[in-house]
Amino acid sequence: MGIFKKNPFGHILFLKRWLIRIAGAMTHRRYRGFNELQIVGSEILTNLPDRNVLFVSNHQTYFADVVSMFHVFNASLSGRTDSIKNIGYLWDPKLNLYYVAAGETMKAGLLPRILAYAGAITVSRTWREKGKEIDRQVNLKDTENIGIALDDGWVITFPQGTTKPWKPIRKGTAHIIKNYKPIVVPIVIDGFRRSFDKKGLRIKKRGILQSFEVKEPLVIDYENDSVEKIVEQLEYAIEQHPSFLKVIPTEEIEAEEELNKKRKWEY
């Protein structure tokens, strides 16, 4: 039974393990080679339980964001701190790691379908499909599948549901948090939009300093906090609240300019 053991979604773990190993080896230099991924807070990952953890993050590309998380999570769980040096951590990857993705995206070609086997929980967008605005009810099966994944392990979600910055948080994420009561860990990424194309499959620029920050779990009163309060908390946590668009002090601008010197494109 060992080699054919499956996860709750029917995926054979032996195949998933090899898929993560191969995909990880093929993409490693995208974050440590062609570009540099600067990681902060990865030690937080080692203190989390093995299941019922929800990671919430801002979103910059379809696939590169998630792939970086597979690298950082597995590297941290294998003993590395803020580093993905030496891809030996891919030999024994965390197999109960999932990510929420639009079904439309994961069916758009052979490669997305293969990547879906690595842990995608596909959901139907309620507001957009094939580039057009729509309005439909939430598919309760989608929510149920996220609950199944949380019961089995860790789940990554992008609560804005789009790669465009400053878009509002979808309330569905807050409802999931209230219903399943996971530990909620925010992640803030940057530099991916400059490094990759929108899909995150093609390298657009090299020599980009990418950043990846893992924050402490949020303090949430699952019973008494309103959906609106949780949404606002998520906006602040992943630094997508409108207040982050405020006028930036001069000293912060100067510090950012120094950092941008490391982000200059190399041709």
Regions from the PLM with identified roles:
Residues T27-Q60, F70:
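Helix-to-loop junction immediately C-terminal to a conserved catalytic motif
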Residues Q38-G41, K107, N139-T143, I169-T173:
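Amphipathic coiled-coil/heptad-repeat helices and related helical stalk/stem segments
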Residues P49-E133:
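Catalytic core of membrane glycerolipid acyltransferases/transacylases, capturing the structured
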Residues I121-W166:
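Internal catalytic-core helix/loop-beta-alpha segment
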Residues D151-I156, G161-K229:
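A cross-family acyltransferase "interaction/gating" segment
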Residues I230-P242:
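Short, well-structured alpha-helical segments that form the helix of a local strand-helix-strand
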Residues P249-Y267:
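Short, highly charged C-terminal tails/helix-capping segments
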